[in-house]
Amino acid sequence: MQRLMLKSKIHRATVTDADLHYEGSISIDEALMEAADLLPYEKVAIYDVNNGERFTTYVITGKRGSGVICLNGAAARKVAKGDLVIIASYVIVDGEEAKGWKPTCVFVDPENQIKH
């Protein structure tokens, strides 16, 4: 049996911008992408802590070290600048691997810099 498991998440990132007229996606600081093992065009779930919205989109690479978390296109209607979001990616694993599965969790400060 296979299971869909949380692969990684960026926990409580601050939305830095929302650009309605840009091609749909979420721009994420490249350093955060690497820490969360996210690739360009990878599907992610977005959970807005402030308003309860939950939706999916795909990742595009933002400037490294900028702290950018920008929702683009239609997704821009689901968030507001300053909202806290959880960005989650999932992976399918077999049942035995799932028993000991541990996702990668990236915690950030209010400027979306990785907490160590």
Swiss-Prot record:
Q: Pathway membership of this protein?
A: Cofactor biosynthesis; (R)-pantothenate biosynthesis; beta-alanine from L-aspartate: step 1/1
Q: Main subcellular localization, coarse class?
A: cytoplasm
Which residues are substrate-binding? 57, 73-75
* Listed EC numbers: 4.1.1.11
Write down which residues bear the modification named Pyruvic acid (Ser): 25
Task: Give the subcellular location.
Answer: Cytoplasm
Q: How is it modified after translation?
A: Is synthesized initially as an inactive proenzyme, which is activated by self-cleavage at a specific serine bond to produce a beta-subunit with a hydroxyl group at its C-terminus and an alpha-subunit with a pyruvoyl group at its N-terminus.
Active-site residues, record numbering mapped to chain:
25 (schiff-base intermediate with substrate), 58 (proton donor)
The Gene Ontology biological process annotation of the record reads: alanine biosynthetic process; pantothenate biosynthetic process
Which family does the similarity line name? Answer: Belongs to the PanD family.
Q: What does this protein do?
A: Catalyzes the pyruvoyl-dependent decarboxylation of aspartate to produce beta-alanine.
Name the record gives this protein: Aspartate 1-decarboxylase
Which organism is this entry from?
A: Syntrophus aciditrophicus (strain SB)
